[in-house]
UniProtKB/Swiss-Prot annotation:
Official protein name in the record: Tryptophan synthase beta chain
Protein species of origin: Helicobacter pylori (strain J99 / ATCC 700824)
Top-level taxon: Bacteria
Entry GO terms, CC: cytoplasm
Pathway: Amino-acid biosynthesis; L-tryptophan biosynthesis; L-tryptophan from chorismate: step 5/5
Function noted in UniProt: The beta subunit is responsible for the synthesis of L-tryptophan from indole and L-serine.
C-alpha cells in the first residue's frame, strides 16, 4: 500500500487498470516538480503577477453586531478568475506543460473551475475541454460563455443527475483513452491519489497567507477558521496552515440545502457513510442500498455527494468540525454581506459566512474569526434573483 495515498483509512486510488499508468506518471511528475526550483519560481511568479496574490485579509466593519468579535474575510474573490480555483488550475496546468501534455480536460459544477482551467490553458497555450452537467449549464450560463470566450470547448453531460459527479465520470472516461497527450485537471481535493495531495499543495498558500496576515494585524492566531465544503479544496487550502495549531478551531460548513432531515442537501460529512467514489475512499451520500444519492444545494459548486478524503480523516480524528447551512441561511448571509460590507460573495462562500455569523452572535468572550471568502458572486446573481423573486428585504 502506498501510505502517501492515504489519510488514515481514507483516500487511496481505486481506479480502472487503464488509469494506473496515467496516475503513476502524474505522481512522479508532481514529486519532481515539488523539488524543482525553476518550477516553483515560475509558479509563484505567476501567482504574484498574473493571479494577483497575496489576496487581502479584510476586517468586516458592519456585519457583526457583537463587539467582542472580529470577523475577517480571506478575499479569494479578488484574485484573477474570481475564486480560489485559479490557484491550483494554474499549478496543474504548469505541471502538465512540464510533462509534455498538449490537451487539458476538466470537470466543473458552478463553472468556476472550468473558467479557471480555461484561463490557465489560454495563458499556457494548451487545448482545453470542459465537461459540465446539463443542469449546471442551465444554472451557470454566463460561466459557460466565459469558458467559450477563453477558448475552451464545453461538453454537456446529461447522464445521471446531469451535475458535477456525472461530469467527473465523463472526464475520467475521456482520460482513460487519452492520457498520453492529455492531463485531467481535477477541480477539488478528492479523486484518486495524487490529486487530494496535489490540489492541497496548490491551494495551501491561502492558509499560509492568512497565518502571516493575521499575526501582522492581531499579533495572534485566530480562534476559528471557517470555510465552505463541497469537495473541499478551499477549506483544505486554508486549514492546512493551522492543522498543528490545536488552539485554532477548524470548521467546515456543508450545504444543508432544504434541511438535513430531507434528502435535498449535500451534507456528506454530517449525513453520509464511508464508501468509494471517483477513485477514493471517503464519506459519501448513499441511499439505503448503498447507491450514490443525489445531492442538492442552491450553490452548484457545493452540489456534490462526496468530499475530499482528508476532510473525512480530519472529521474522524476530531481535528475539524463539520457544520452546515441551509439554502435560506446562505441567501441571507449573501444579502447581508452585500448590504453591510459592499461585497458580493459566491453562494458557496455564503454558507461559511452564514455559520460564522451565527457563531459570532454566541461568543461571550473576545474572539477572532476568519472566513475563507472563496469566490465572488457575479456567477450567482440570476440564481439569487430567482430565489428572492427579484426582491430584497
Amino acid at each position: 500500500m502506498n501510505q502517501k495515498a492515504y489519510f488514515g483509512e481514507f483516500g487511496g486510488s481505486f481506479v480502472s487498470e487503464l488509469l494506473v499508468p496515467a496516475l503513476r506518471e502524474l505522481e512522479q511528475a508532481f514529486d519532481t516538480c515539488l523539488k524543482d526550483e525553476e518550477f516553483q519560481k515560475e509558479y509563484f511568479r505567476l501567482l504574484k503577477d498574473f493571479v494577483g496574490r497575496p489576496s487581502p485579509l479584510t476586517l468586516c466593519q458592519n456585519i457583526v453586531s457583537n463587539p467582542k468579535v472580529k470577523l475577517y474575510l480571506k478575499r479569494e474573490d479578488l484574485i484573477h478568475g474570481g475564486a480560489h480555483k485559479t490557484n491550483q488550475a494554474l499549478g496543474q496546468a504548469l505541471l502538465a506543460k512540464k510533462m509534455g501534455k498538449t490537451r487539458i480536460i476538466a470537470e466543473t459544477g458552478a463553472g468556476q473551475h472550468g473558467v479557471a482551467t480555461a484561463i490557465a490553458c489560454a495563458l499556457l497555450n494548451l487545448k482545453c475541454v470542459i465537461f459540465m452537467g446539463g443542469k449546471d449549464i442551465k444554472r451557470q450560463e454566463m460561466n459557460v460563455f466565459r469558458m467559450r470566450l477563453l477558448g475552451a470547448e464545453v461538453r454537456e453531460v446529461n447522464s445521471g443527475s446531469a451535475t458535477l459527479k456525472d461530469a467527473v465520470n465523463e472526464a475520467l472516461r475521456d482520460w482513460a483513452s487519452s492520457y498520453k497527450d492529455t492531463h485531467y485537471l481535477l477541480g477539488t481535493s478528492a479523486g484518486p491519489h495524487p490529486y487530494p495531495t496535489m490540489v492541497k499543495t496548490f491551494q495551501k498558500m491561502i492558509g499560509d497567507e492568512v497565518k502571516s496576515q493575521i499575526l501582522e494585524k492581531e499579533n495572534r492566531l485566530p480562534d476559528y477558521v471557517i470555510a465552505c465544503v463541497g469537495g473541499g479544496s478551499n477549506a483544505i487550502g486554508i486549514f492546512s496552515a493551522f492543522l498543528n495549531d490545536k488552539e485554532v478551531k477548524l470548521i467546515g460548513v456543508e450545504p444543508a440545502g432544504l434541511g438535513l432531515e430531507t434528502n435535498k442537501h449535500g451534507a456528506t460529512l454530517n449525513k453520509g457513510r464511508v464508501g468509494i467514489l471517483h477513485g477514493n475512499k471517503t464519506y459519501l451520500l448513499q441511499d439505503d442500498e448503498g447507491q450514490i444519492a443525489e445531492s442538492h444545494s442552491i450553490s452548484a459548486g457545493l452540489d456534490y455527494p462526496g468530499v475530499g478524503p482528508e476532510h473525512s480523516y480530519l472529521k474522524e480524528i476530531g481535528r475539524a468540525v463539520y457544520e452546515s447551512a441551509s439554502d435560506i441561511e446562505a441567501l441571507e448571509a449573501f444579502r447581508l454581506l452585500c448590504q453591510k460590507e459592499g461585497i458580493i460573495p459566491a453562494l458557496e462562500s455564503s454558507h461559511a459566512l452564514a455559520y460564522a455569523l451565527k457563531l459570532a452572535q454566541k461568543c461571550a468572550q473576545e474572539k477572532i474569526i476568519v472566513v475563507n471568502l472563496s469566490g465572488r458572486g457575479d456567477k450567482d446573481l440570476s440564481t439569487v434573483y430567482n430565489a428572492l423573486k427579484g426582491g430584497l428585504k
